[in-house]
Regions:
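Propeptide-to-catalytic entry region of secreted or membrane-anchored zinc metalloproteases
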Residues: 1-140
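Active-site-proximal beta-strand/loop segments in catalytic clefts of secreted hydrolases
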Residues: 18-22, 150-155, 179-180, 224-226
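Short pre-active-site segment immediately N-terminal to the catalytic Zn-binding motif
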Residues: 167-186
Length: 264
């Protein structure tokens, strides 16, 4: 729980998202951008309402990067899709490549934000470009916790959204989100604070555990979010423990906090 830049999901946090165009996704039109902004607002309202229901103080600020004259950042994915970018030729190399892709985008954004040389970044050797951008955002928005999301427009394609660097402390965590549904955005936002998938993904593969989770939590936001409406979904006590809203958990869940090499 609480790794890197996405710390405690309480009090003031920032959701910052960047629209990215590339040659294999649909272009971001002004309509697409505005409808995504609207979806983010819906997702935030739902998340804050879930927090209130569970007596958790939470205020999510949000903002996004857009260039002059409504221009996006152009940066091709390492492979033709998000899924292939992360998994080919293997997961280890794919994750390295998607981190380089995100750093290049953050660097480009940073050049337009006038990020100073001394902006409060941690004193670490060779800080990544994502780190510098997030340090700037922390200072500008006066928050400790920043959820960084790269939005790609895969609305008419079959692809995935994915969280990166949530299983290590070597780099800042971020998400690549393919779809503008509010549930998709809320789902991936929660990933950055420690929430775990409850369906088959790159990080969740055990069929038996997936079956158990689906029986226990059929209305959970961390189930497959594609095209689902937020109405009727919930943040289960299992997920609340992972994101820090609860200090303990039902012992019956013990085996469900691991999946092969991953500890959630």
């Amino acid at each position: 729980m609480f790794k890197n830049v996405c710390k405690d999901l309480k009090h003031d946090v920032l959701l910052y998202y960047i629209f990215v165009d590339n040659k294999t996704t649909s272009p971001w039109t002004e309509y697409d951008i505005q409808s995504t902004v609207d979806s983010v607002k819906v997702a935030i309202r739902w998340l804050e309402e879930q927090a209130r229901k569970n007596n958790v103080p939470l205020k999510i600020k949000s903002d996004y990067y857009i260039g002059p004259e409504f221009t996006t950042v152009n940066r091709n994915l390492p492979q033709p899709s998000v899924q292939k970018s992360v998994t080919e030729p293997n997961l280890k190399t794919g994750l390295k490549n998607i981190n380089m892709w995100a750093d290049a985008i953050a660097k480009r954004v940073g050049t337009t934000l006038n990020i100073a040389a001394k902006d409060g970044i941690p004193d670490v050797k060779n800080p990544k470009n994502k780190e510098r951008l997030i340090a700037y955002l922390r200072d500008t928005y006066q928050v400790e916790s920043v959820a960084l999301i790269f939005m790609v427009n895969n609305y008419f394609k079959n692809d995935i959204s994915i969280q990166i660097n949530t299983f290590n402390t070597e780099d800042v965590e971020f998400a690549v989100v393919s779809y503008k549904y509010p549930a998709e955005i809320a789902h991936n936002f929660l990933h950055l604070y420690g929430a775990a998938d409850m369906y088959e993904t790159a990080f969740r593969r055990n069929d038996s555990k997936i079956d158990q989770l689906q029986k226990l939590f059929p209305n959970e936001i961390m189930m497959e979010p594609y095209a689902r409406k937020l109405t009727g979904l919930e943040i289960s006590d299992y997920t609340q423990y992972l994101i820090g809203w609860k200090n303990d958990y039902n012992p019956a869940y013990e085996s469900l906090f691991t999946d092969r090499a991953y500890n959630f």
